[in-house]
């Protein structure tokens, strides 16, 4: 068990300005669309028209080459962009009760905005585009946020990857 990220988490697409060697190496493999880094995992999304059988061997070789004994865990600084009480409370619920469970499935969820009773969240990593994410969002995430932050009437997904 190797710690990949010491602090924070981060998602990369091919269009991002990338200066991390491990990210450049993974994107050197054709048909990789997205890479998401969290504490002890990396989630990689391939193009829809590609096959994991064609990518796995090359990706594993890259990861074994990059994540060696002297690998220094990545640090992604994260600061809250919200100053209102309700948004801060929503972030607290996400960070303490929801994100750890979502991370176990290779994804992440972040508050994008809160206005007039509607919390808009970003789905990242394996959660972005996952067929069951809508059900999880409405029956799990929304229910929990509404329980702890009664001002919230609805939680909606905002997916930047679609």
What feature does the model see in each segment?
Residues 1-162:
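Domain-level signature for proteins that mediate thiol-based redox and metal-cofactor handling
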């Amino acid at each position: 068990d190797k710690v990949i990220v010491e602090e924070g988490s981060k998602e990369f697409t091919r269009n991002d300005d990338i200066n991390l060697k491990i990210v450049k190496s993974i994107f050197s493999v054709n048909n990789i669309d997205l890479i998401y880094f969290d504490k002890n995992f990396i989630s990689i999304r391939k193009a829809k028209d590609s096959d994991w059988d064609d990518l796995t061997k090359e990706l594993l070789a890259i990861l074994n080459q990059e994540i060696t004994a002297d690998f220094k865990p990545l640090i992604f600084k994260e600061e809250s962009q919200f100053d209102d009480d309700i948004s801060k409370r929503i972030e607290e619920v996400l960070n303490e009760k929801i994100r750890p469970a979502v991370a176990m499935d290779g994804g992440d969820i972040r508050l994008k905005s809160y206005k007039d009773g509607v919390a808009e969240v970003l789905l990242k990593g394996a959660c972005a585009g996952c067929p069951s994410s809508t059900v999880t969002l409405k029956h799990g995430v929304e229910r929990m946020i509404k329980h702890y932050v009664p001002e919230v009437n609805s939680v909606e997904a905002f997916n930047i990857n679609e």
